[in-house]
Amino acid sequence: MSAIFNFQSLLTVILLLICTCAYIRSLAPSLLDRNKTGLLGIFWKCARIGERKSPYVAVCCIVMAFSILFIQ
């Protein structure tokens, strides 16, 4: 089933996107800072969310990991 139609899979993909973009921006900031607007601006926005809300994103990742490991 596609991640678009399954809510838990959609949340997992969004969390992975946020974490990946924040990690890439920490390694190479100029890579994401070039595209702050437009379609590629989504990755810059995800990186900003990952940087600013990192405790909340970390808690969401832990909760999602436990739900995938133990509930499914």
Curated annotation (Swiss-Prot):
Q: Which residues lie on this side of the membrane: Extracellular?
A: 27-53
Q: What is its main location?
A: Golgi
Q: Which GO terms describe its cellular component?
A: Golgi apparatus; Golgi membrane
Carbohydrate-modified residues: 35
* Protein name as catalogued: Protein kish-A
* Compartments it resides in: Golgi apparatus membrane
Gene name, Swiss-Prot/TrEMBL: TMEM167A
Q: Does the keyword Glycoprotein apply?
A: yes
Q: Which organism is it from?
A: Homo sapiens
Q: Where in the sequence is the signal peptide annotated? A: 1-26
Q: Which residues lie on this side of the membrane: Cytoplasmic?
A: 72
Transmembrane feature ranges: 54-71
The task this protein performs is described as:
Involved in the early part of the secretory pathway.
